[in-house]
Amino acid sequence: MSTPDPERDWMTYARELGTNLHRARMAKGESQERIAHAAGLAGYTYQKFEKGESKPGSPANPQLKTLFALCEALDIELSDLLPPNPPRSSGSAGAE
C-alpha cells in the first residue's frame, strides 16, 4: 500500500483520481455517458468524478463500490485508478 503523504491534500488527490479516470476512458475510446451508464452512475455524477469535485471546492469522494464499478466499466484494476501516496486521513497522524 502507498505511504500517506502529510503534505498532500484531498482535493489534489481527488483531481489526480479524476485525471486517471479521464485517461482510462480516453484509452478505451468511450464517452463519459457510456462509462457512467456501464458503472450504474448518472452522467453528471461521472463528470464530477473526472473533475475531482463533488461540488465546487469539495473533493470527490466516491464509495468503494463505485470505484470498483468504474474499474469494471473501464477494464482496469483499482490500483490503476488510485493515485499513489494518498494524503493522511484526519485523525491518523502518528497512528500506525
Which residue ranges define each predicted feature?
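A short, Lys/Arg-rich alpha-helix, primarily the initiator
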Residues: 2-29
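Short alpha-helical DNA-recognition segment
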Residues: 29-55
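Short, basic-rich loop-to-helix N-cap that marks the start of a DNA-contacting helix
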Residues: 29, 53-72
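The alpha-helix within a helix-turn-helix
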Residues: 25, 36, 71
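Short, charged recognition helix plus adjacent turn
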Residues: 2-7, 72, 79-96
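Residues within the helices of the helix-turn-helix
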Residues: 22-23, 33, 68
